[in-house]
Amino acid sequence: MAMAHEPMTADALATDQGLPGKFLGVILNDLRRAGIVVSHRGREAGYNLARPASQITLADVIRALEGPLAQVRGLRPETATYQGAAKHLQDAWIAVRASLRAVLEHITIEQVATGEMAPEVAQLLADPDAWVARRLA
């Protein structure tokens, strides 16, 4: 759908992405309500992006599907307060949100479809450590 000009049906999208149709239907409905996709009825039924893929970021999609990029105990970081020795933990959560924004607001649907990431994202991906999962010792 990212690079397609013709509407794509929900069934075709589900098959293409290996997702259950009902699950994808919920996602498409959320994306439609957020103004990321538009739906078409009738002979040309299906979905299209509401604006060019180069203008839709992963942050837009995540916010449409999940809400805020970062939450702490169900709260936005700026409203999560801590006491005593943990009082500066809020600063850490706000920094986490800023880091997520720095990446997710610079990756567009077009870049995901083509694999051509923004330089700041490509630099992060070039670090071999970025590809290593970390686990508790």
What are these regions (language model features)?
Residues 1-20, 48:
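N-terminal helix-turn-helix DNA-binding core of bacterial DNA-binding proteins
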Residues 53-78, 91-98:
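Conserved segment of winged-helix/HTH DNA-binding domains
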Residues 35-49:
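Beta-hairpin "wing" of winged helix-turn-helix
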Residues 33-36, 64:
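Residue cluster at the C-terminal edge of the helix-turn-helix DNA-binding motif
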Residues 78-137:
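C-terminal regulatory/oligomerization modules of transcriptional regulators
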Residues 15, 32-33:
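Alpha-helical residues within the helix-turn-helix
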